[in-house]
Amino acid sequence: MSSNSFGKLFTVTTFGESHGPAIGCVIDGCPPGLALDAAEFAHDLQRRATGKSRHTSARREADEVEILSGVYEGLTTGTPIALLIRNTDQRSKDYANIGQQFRPGHADYSYWHKYGIRDPRGGGRSSARETTMRVAAGVVAKKWLAERFGVTVRGYLSQLGEITPAGFDWSAVKDNPFFWPHAAQVPELEAYMDALRKSGDSVGACVDVVADNVPPGWGEPIYGKLDGDLAAALMSINAVKGVEIGDGFASAVQKGTEHRDLLTPQGFASNHAGGILGGISTGQPVVASIVLKPTSSLRLPGPSLDTSGNVVEVVTTGRHDPCVGIRATPIAEAMVAMVLMDQALRHRAQCGDVGTITPRIPGQFDG
């Protein structure tokens, strides 16, 4: 298996390279009857797109989706949905000098040893360009989850370098290019990124994703845990080096009396577990966080090796993001939505008729 497919019942297979003629995906397992047209993909794809601010790559792609199959008269048919986006703004000449060199911190060296051949143009298959189709598939998952269960999946940038939000307001996230939840800090972020870009360096970031209204019961024990699937899905995103569910690694310094999420008739008293216990959703918000490393595509020279083992000096030209975390928010949202839809369908297949006499308590109360 080449691992280009994701999911068990709701499956997504992506294809294409950064500088190839097109990228695409095939979505299988989407239930029939979901209203869907090409225009619905535009919003999230533009949120992910490059060239929208001076703080991201200058590459400009239209990212217009062509629906090739699986939709008839505006409704999904239950058959595979094939989506295609044509690449129109490749500049492969920017990579002419590194075809035989290994860029430090990139997948060049590992791809070379695995396949014995690699596409150096923009990173080929290892480029974040591939995530465009994940966002497209996420649009389908988000819509189905919202219509079927009222589930919403939202994300925001929770750290940029050493800067963290001084406040939080969901309404601020959509109004700035950083997906930052505190509008008053945006000028600080602008100044920080301007200085970083001038220096030729890059920086890491963190993104948080929150899924609200997830019903209790989604996820499977042991090898199909909801948090396990979320971790695997989020770790598959380019540059992600760590995943937390709920309080994550902060749990190491908490006492049990603090970390346990007490149940009351009014709701859970806290959500340290991130809405998942035993690998199964509790009805609380599902909360996941990712950390993204600083990109290694730098204008600053660094020593490396070529394919013959000779020492070379590598300078990465081309158009790159000084912080890949800025555009990662819609990608992380898409992966969370895809996991939730897959788990929802899996739950319905085995336990759709299960009912309990225990009343469903609210996700959390402010007590």
Curated annotation (Swiss-Prot):
Binding residues annotated for FMN, in chain numbering: R125, S126, S127, N238, A239, G278, K293, P294, T295, S296, S297, R319
Keyword Lyase in annotation: yes
Note accompanying the cofactor annotation: Reduced FMN (FMNH(2)).
Enzyme Commission number(s) of this protein: 4.2.3.5
Alphabetized HAMAP family for the sequence: Chorismate_synth
Subunit (UniProt): Homotetramer.
GO cellular-component term (any): cytosol
GO MF annotation: an example: FMN binding
Descriptive protein name: Chorismate synthase
Reactions listed under catalytic activity: 5-O-(1-carboxyvinyl)-3-phosphoshikimate = chorismate + phosphate
Binding site for NADP(+): R48, R54
Described function: This reaction introduces a second double bond into the aromatic ring system.
Family of the protein in this entry: Belongs to the chorismate synthase family.
One Pfam family of this chain: Chorismate_synt
Pathway recorded for this protein: Metabolic intermediate biosynthesis; chorismate biosynthesis; chorismate from D-erythrose 4-phosphate and phosphoenolpyruvate: step 7/7
Biological process, per Gene Ontology: amino acid biosynthetic process; aromatic amino acid family biosynthetic process; chorismate biosynthetic process
PANTHER family linked: CHORISMATE SYNTHASE
Keywords: Amino-acid biosynthesis, Aromatic amino acid biosynthesis, FAD, Flavoprotein, FMN, Lyase, NADP
InterPro entries in alphabetical order: Chorismate_synth, Chorismate_synth_AroC_sf, Chorismate_synthase_CS
